[in-house]
Amino acid sequence: MRNWKLLPVLALATIIVAVVLYVAFYFFFLDLFVDLWWFRSLDFEGYFWLRLLYRFILSGGVTLVFFSIFFFHFWIASRYLGLNPPDDVLLDADKRRRFQRFADVFMNGSIKIYTPLSLLLAIVVAIPFYEQWEQALLFFFGESSGLVDPVYGQNASFYMLSYPIYMLIQQELLYTAAILFLLVGILYWLEHVFVPNQNQEYPLGAKIHLTILMGFVVMFVIWGFILDRYSLLYVSNHEPVFFGPGFVDMRFYLPLIWLSIVTFLAVAITAGLFIFSKKHRIKWPFLVSLALFGSVLGLEKVKIIPDLMNQLIVQPNPVEAEGSFMKYNIDATLDAYDLNKIKIIDYQVSLDASQDIKDWSTKKHFENIPVWDREFLQDVYQQLQ
């Protein structure tokens, strides 16, 4: 009787499973199999699987790389560089044994925390790569276009294929380095506080490790400033005269970007010396460099200086001030449409049109001019010109 009671439940479960399988096959796998058979008939089955799996291979590879970076630094910080017992603990066998036992408990417990944390951080940091995997493929497999940017001398394919990925990679690597620096610093602090019988001074290995991580943060920030230079090429406030950077952009904003790099590097160096030096900690170099860096960033937001440059230098003689930048736009347009091989002939314009009219009268240029039709007269005149 018990088996008979289970039959309706089994029948209902079978129906539900069948419906789920049918829906999955109809909405997901039907197109997949049709495409597979089509590509297989063309002997392109390998390409089909690559096209299908590219996003998962790329996403999985990026996640694995970021997970390895996080896990490696956490593992180094907890295993080797964070423990600094004094000499009396190392010389006494009982104290050394107790210290090692507590340290082992701390390291084994911390690995259970930072392993899933590394995976979670890797997934969060790699999310933009999941969404823009097609651009990443173009970055890896794109070829040179053969056209050179007249401003910075970069290949045109750099701006279409590489520059967007560089912006994405720079942000993700900066987040990764900053998170690592913060969390590894917290891990060293926890080891220093909760593991007993340690020196008050942090070990040399921990300082070197934190300095390296801080160096990565600085490097990625500077890389971001360098990439900001290329954003000046997308300025459109000079249209319809020309597209791209003008006098103010290249003579004011570009030097500010370089000043931002120099002052931020000074902030990083003075901060590192202040944090990691044992003695003679002086605050004023760090404060001065920080104030200079903040001033440079503030100048980018102030509009009075570029407005004055525009009013006093550009507007009185725009051709003289921005002629070279207009030429950049002209050269780029000629390269884009492959017009740089055209022979250019300069015609001398005579202010006296009587001779031109006399010549035209013999060449019958006026036969088809609709002088009676006001609607078409101006268009025909423009065509003749």
Labelled PLM ranges:
Residues 5-9, 15-18, 22-385:
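Soluble extracytoplasmic regions of secretory-pathway and membrane proteins
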Residues 1-3:
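N-terminal hydrophobic targeting signals that begin at the initiator methionine
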